[in-house]
Amino acid sequence: MYGTTELIASLDLGTTSARAIIFNAEGRPLAASQKPLTQYFPHDGWVEQDAEEIWQKQKECLLGTLADLKLSGSGLRALGITNQRETTIVWSKKTGKPIYRAIVWQDRRTAAFCERLHDSGLEPLIHDKTGLCLDPYFSASKVRWILDNVEGAREKALAGELLFGTVDSWLIWNLTGGLGHVTDVSNASRTLLFNIHNCRWDEELLDIFGI
């Protein structure tokens, strides 16, 4: 029914739902699927999601749209991802399992840590390198919290056994069966760890956040 070079899939992993839409070469949507995501609020100001559910719901949406068109993944020319960019996931390189729930962009648990960095006079340096304000909204302090509060996390990170990613990285890791641990500039630039002037992870920022 469709040529194998004309279809593009779009994955949209938002805060409240996962969606997949398949478009033809003219940009006309041919099939779509959407599934809700569960949010958890264990304490005031904390917002979490199950990273496994994120992957499963997104996969179900993609497979559903392919099934509607009687296609397999090989019938797609390309696949694009849009996502909640600051949400933070840390998982085991060996097992592919998250070591903690995804900490959502709305989460404010690291406000006191960010305030200490501000009081230390580090905000101008951070802003100059990243173009961002120093705020719990972004990923860096969330990664620091996981390393400090999940048992054994920092030791495993030092041993090279853990991977960090925003939601796009987590989805690509799973879509590729663990072969691709990647992101792009638009997501990396929302972590507070990425130098926007040279487009590299910044060692000084990593040291500041203790990652």
Describe the predicted segments one by one.
Residues 15, 26, 126-211:
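Gly/Ser/Thr-rich active-site cleft segment
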Residues 103-120:
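Short alpha-helix plus adjacent loop in nuclease-associated cores
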Residues 67-105, 133-139, 172-195:
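Short beta-strand-loop/turn "lid" adjacent to the catalytic site in phosphate-handling enzymes
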Residues 95-98, 116-121, 125:
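Hydrophobic or amphipathic alpha-helical targeting/insertion segments
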Residues 1-100, 128:
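N-terminal glycine/serine-rich phosphate-binding loop of ATP-dependent small-molecule kinases
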